[in-house]
UniProtKB/Swiss-Prot annotation:
<comment type="pathway">
    <text>Lipid metabolism; fatty acid biosynthesis.</text>
</comment>
<feature type="domain" description="Carrier">
    <location>
        <begin position="2"/>
        <end position="77"/>
    </location>
</feature>
<dbReference type="InterPro" id="IPR036736">
    <property type="entry name" value="ACP-like_sf"/>
</dbReference>
<dbReference type="InterPro" id="IPR006162">
    <property type="entry name" value="Ppantetheine_attach_site"/>
</dbReference>
<keyword id="KW-0597">Phosphoprotein</keyword>
<dbReference type="Pfam" id="PF00550">
    <property type="entry name" value="PP-binding"/>
</dbReference>
<keyword id="KW-0444">Lipid biosynthesis</keyword>
<dbReference type="GO" id="GO:0016020">
    <property type="term" value="C:membrane"/>
</dbReference>
<comment type="function">
    <text>Carrier of the growing fatty acid chain in fatty acid biosynthesis.</text>
</comment>
<dbReference type="GO" id="GO:0005829">
    <property type="term" value="C:cytosol"/>
</dbReference>
<keyword id="KW-0963">Cytoplasm</keyword>
<feature type="modified residue" description="O-(pantetheine 4'-phosphoryl)serine">
    <location>
        <position position="37"/>
    </location>
</feature>
<comment type="similarity">
    <text>Belongs to the acyl carrier protein (ACP) family.</text>
</comment>
<dbReference type="GO" id="GO:0000035">
    <property type="term" value="F:acyl binding"/>
</dbReference>
<dbReference type="GO" id="GO:0009245">
    <property type="term" value="P:lipid A biosynthetic process"/>
</dbReference>
<keyword id="KW-0275">Fatty acid biosynthesis</keyword>
<dbReference type="GO" id="GO:0000036">
    <property type="term" value="F:acyl carrier activity"/>
</dbReference>
Length: 78
């Protein structure tokens, strides 16, 4: 689980140009990390590539925090 959290945070840091140390599990991509709609689309694509999964658009819209991304990935790995 920690490995997934770290991987998600690394991707978020790379995609949004923020310091990984500033990213918390409850960080909102838009409100806390300054992402815009294009950033969030690119972030979802990067997560799909990293974790070899597909995140449907209706689900991607619900993923607004680091923890929600981690939870979605964990649910898909079961």
């Amino acid at each position: 689980m920690d490995n997934i959290v770290e991987r998600v945070k690394k991707i978020v840091a790379e995609q949004l140009g923020v310091n990984e140390a500033d990213i918390k599990n409850e960080s909102s991509f838009v409100d806390d990390l300054g992402a815009d709609s294009l950033d969030t689309v690119e972030l979802v694509m990067a997560l799909e590539e990293e974790f070899e999964c597909e995140i449907p658009d209706d689900q991607a819209e619900k993923i607004t925090t680091v923890q929600q991304a981690v939870d979605y990935i964990l649910a898909g790995k079961k």
